[in-house]
């Protein structure tokens, strides 16, 4: 093991605890390959300890007055703001995205904490004083207990902040299993929450892989599971946790289509599509992975997209003006290369080859912006979620055809349209099968006070993340009818 490189600890019952598993994995900087830390691959027994700590803490936390919980969250928000730059740098170091994008991700995480701090309002029930003569009814919200969260590598700040602040604000306790690829940020979030005054055991972190995940899904004292990640894993999480009687929300894969109409402002469309397709190296569930070019604008649109992609600076995200950082691991880079080779083999036209960018030869896991033209819906690069800076362009003649193409996908997370025509927007809104829609913008991810998630194979469950859906997910109701 490299001298001077820390081995991370689990956070259980308010204490930093060394894993007893004896197993670790390296956490490299994707831009350089340098090992930043080692993450423990913890055992199921260690997960059980965290659940016990959370269950014990729930006894008192659930009875903590809601305004007191809110004050702790307000303090937490203040600390996150004070450490904003530190957190953004840490996101860039372990994830690889540009510092500007990491800074924005920290902002989105802080906004989630701000929403959760509104717990006194969010937890309010409803009452009707006269359902019959002398009889009244009321609905009251209560926490559900110990909640488990399983988060991905691509948003190590934002996605955990979707989960544990709101769950905790609602009176629950939480066990977080962050991605073993980006574990350092999760530990820092826990440190700051403790500094804000969060009681021991309310938030716990257990690093690991399959044993920890399965432990969360099957543990009888875990009442709900929130998951963000790939579609196959999300489906497994949903089925396994549901079979063990848990409430589940699983946000999974995506293949987001951007429809560009002939009347669109192409400069706006190109700017937004470039940001949406290649920001975060394409490793996000709201990435624009398919452009559907409608009618005669296709040639000009392709030309402008390639020209804009050629201007992007590729490199270490900590360097000034870098737009496109590396993908998360060498294996993911090689997987992306295989998709590019497959796209060529299946007959798509490769108009920009990200394998040829100079940065690809560096030590990091770089792949440049890649664009395919004349892609069809029978091609693998259209069907699969590549999760990399690869953009496919499909050509059609009408909006009806464009919507048909988008709706063929088994994924339905997001979709966008670029147009000046309100009639086009209305038709798109009514007929597209997707959960989050954008008009003349590339990433229609809603703010924390609206629900976030898609349809079809992009989501398993009933209640989405964030907004009042999140409050509903993390609470249960009691109805009381009284005669006086």
From Swiss-Prot:
What are the alphabetically sorted keywords of the record?
Answer: NAD, Oxidoreductase
EC number per UniProt: 1.2.1.27
The pathway is:
Polyol metabolism; myo-inositol degradation into acetyl-CoA; acetyl-CoA from myo-inositol: step 7/7
Q: Where does NAD(+) bind?
A: 153, 177, 180-181, 230, 252, 385
What Gene Ontology terms describe what this protein does at the molecular function level? malonate-semialdehyde dehydrogenase (acetylating) activity; methylmalonate-semialdehyde dehydrogenase (acylating, NAD) activity
What positions constitute the catalytic site?
285
Q: Name one Pfam family in it.
A: Aldedh
Q: Which Gene3D superfamilies match?
A: Aldehyde Dehydrogenase, Chain A, domain 1, Aldehyde Dehydrogenase, Chain A, domain 2
Which terms does the UniProt entry file under GO BP?
A: inositol catabolic process; thymine catabolic process; valine catabolic process
Q: What class of enzyme is it?
A: oxidoreductase
**Function comment:** Catalyzes the oxidation of malonate semialdehyde (MSA) and methylmalonate semialdehyde (MMSA) into acetyl-CoA and propanoyl-CoA, respectively. Is involved in a myo-inositol catabolic pathway. Bicarbonate, and not CO2, is the end-product of the enzymatic reaction.
Q: What is this protein called?
A: Malonate-semialdehyde dehydrogenase 2
């Amino acid at each position: 093991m490299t001298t001077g490189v820390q081995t991370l600890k689990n956070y259980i019952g308010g204490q930093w605890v060394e894993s007893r598993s004896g197993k670790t994995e390296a956490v490299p900087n994707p831009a350089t390959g340098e090992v930043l830390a080692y993450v423990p691959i913890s055992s199921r027994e260690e997960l059980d300890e965290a659940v016990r700590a959370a269950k014990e803490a729930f006894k008192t936390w659930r009875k903590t007055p809601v305004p007191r919980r809110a004050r702790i969250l307000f303090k937490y928000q203040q600390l996150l703001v004070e450490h904003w730059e530190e957190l953004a740098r840490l996101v860039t170091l372990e994830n690889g995205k540009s510092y500007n994008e990491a800074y924005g991700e920290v902002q989105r995480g802080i906004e989630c904490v701000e929403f959760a701090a509104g717990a006194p309002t969010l937890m309010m029930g409803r009452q009707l004083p006269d359902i019959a003569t002398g009889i009244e009814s009321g609905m009251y919200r209560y926490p559900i207990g110990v909640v488990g969260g399983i988060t991905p590598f691509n948003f190590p700040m934002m996605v955990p902040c979707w989960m544990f602040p709101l769950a905790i604000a609602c009176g629950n306790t939480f066990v977080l299993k962050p991605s073993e690829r980006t574990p350092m940020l999760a530990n820092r979030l826990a440190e700051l929450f403790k500094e804000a005054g969060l009681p021991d055991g309310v938030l716990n972190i257990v690093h690991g892989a399959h044993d920890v995940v399965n432990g969360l899904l099957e543990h009888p004292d875990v009442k709900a599971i929130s998951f963000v990640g790939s579609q196959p894993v999300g489906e497994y999480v949903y089925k396994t946790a549901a079979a063990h009687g848990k409430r589940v929300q699983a946000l999974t894969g995506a293949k987001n289509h951007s429809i560009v109409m002939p009347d669109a402002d192409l400069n706006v469309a190109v700017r937004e599509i470039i940001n949406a397709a290649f920001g975060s190296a394409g490793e996000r569930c709201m990435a624009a992975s398919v452009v559907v070019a409608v009618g005669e604008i296709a040639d000009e649109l392709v030309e402008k997209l390639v020209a804009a992609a050629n201007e992007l600076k590729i490199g270490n995200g900590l360097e000034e003006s870098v737009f496109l950082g590396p993908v998360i691991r060498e294996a993911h880079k090689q997987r992306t290369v295989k998709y590019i080779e497959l796209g060529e083999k299946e007959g798509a036209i490769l108009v920009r080859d990200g394998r040829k960018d100079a940065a690809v030869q560096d030590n990091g896991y770089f792949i440049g912006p890649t664009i395919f033209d004349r892609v069809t819906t029978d091609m693998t690069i259209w069907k699969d979620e590549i999760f990399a800076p690869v953009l496919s362009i499909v050509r059609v003649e009408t909006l009806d055809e464009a919507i048909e193409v988008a709706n063929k996908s088994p994924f339905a997370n997001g979709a966008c349209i670029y147009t000046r025509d309100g009639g086009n927007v209305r038709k798109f809104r009514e007929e597209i099968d997707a959960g989050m829609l954008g008009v003349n913008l590339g990433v229609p991810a809603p703010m924390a006070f609206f629900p976030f998630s898609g349809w079809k194979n992009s989501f398993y469950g009933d209640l989405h993340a964030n907004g009042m859906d999140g409050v509903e997910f993390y609470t249960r109701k009691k109805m009381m009818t009284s005669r006086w």
